[in-house]
A protein has these predicted regions:
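Multi-pass alpha-helical transporter architecture, strongest
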Residues: 56, 81, 152, 158-181
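Transmembrane alpha-helix termini and helix-breaking/packing motifs in multi-pass membrane transporters
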Residues: 16-27, 56, 138-157
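Helix-to-loop junctions at the C-terminal end of transmembrane segments
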Residues: 49-63, 147-148
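Helix-loop junctions at membrane interfaces in 12-TM secondary transporters
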Residues: 81-94
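A single, central transmembrane helix in multi-pass transporters
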Residues: 1-48
Length: 181
């Protein structure tokens, strides 16, 4: 559930940010096209660096700590959009978030694999991956509908509440350490 919620949050944030950047010139780096290019490049470089050169400190943290950090960064990104209107702050948070995600995603997959008995791993992991992957277009579609009906401010507010929910859920989430049969 937490992985689906995080995927929904990140895809909704990315979609809404692309729309929001059109109307908020303070967050743009020159033109809209340049800003989107920089946005995507920062994300790609951070994923690459996080995959190849992970910080040992972050890699050794529990998955709960990783999830708390990533959701906190998402909340900070939402706040930065409204409070600071500074593209450098936003892109720094994006880099940190993408870097952290690149480190923790393989760890999350490993936890799922090791918590399931070997005979059922393929089926359960396929279902898990399908559910988590399905939240990406769902997040984009839901936030587009909300943005059209409620506006950007309410949409960002709802995403902030989702980030807070994720943080609360993660605090009380019990990590599974035994194999499910």
């Amino acid at each position: 559930m937490i992985y689906s919620s995080m995927n929904l949050l990140s895809s909704a944030m990315a979609t809404l940010l692309m729309i929001y950047l059109l109307s908020v010139k303070e967050l743009q780096l020159g033109s809209y096209a340049v800003t989107i290019t920089v946005f995507e490049s920062i994300e790609l470089v951070a994923f690459f660096l996080g995959s190849l050169f992970p910080f040992d400190f972050y890699r050794k943290l529990s998955i709960r700590s990783n999830l708390l950090f990533e959701n906190s960064l998402a909340l900070l990104m939402i706040i930065s959009i409204f409070v600071w209107h500074n593209p450098i702050v936003l892109f720094t948070l994006l880099f940190l978030s993408s870097y952290a995600t690149a480190i923790s995603n393989p760890k999350s997959d490993t936890i799922v694999i090791f918590s399931i008995v070997e005979e059922r791993q393929n089926a359960v992991f396929s279902i898990f991956s399908t559910i988590v992957t399905a939240t990406v277009p769902l997040g984009a579609a839901v936030i587009l509908a909300l943005n059209q009906s409620l506006g950007a401010t309410w949409s960002w507010t709802l995403l902030a509440f989702l980030a807070v929910f994720n943080i609360g859920y993660t605090c009380f989430w019990k990590e599974e350490t035994r194999a499910v049969s």
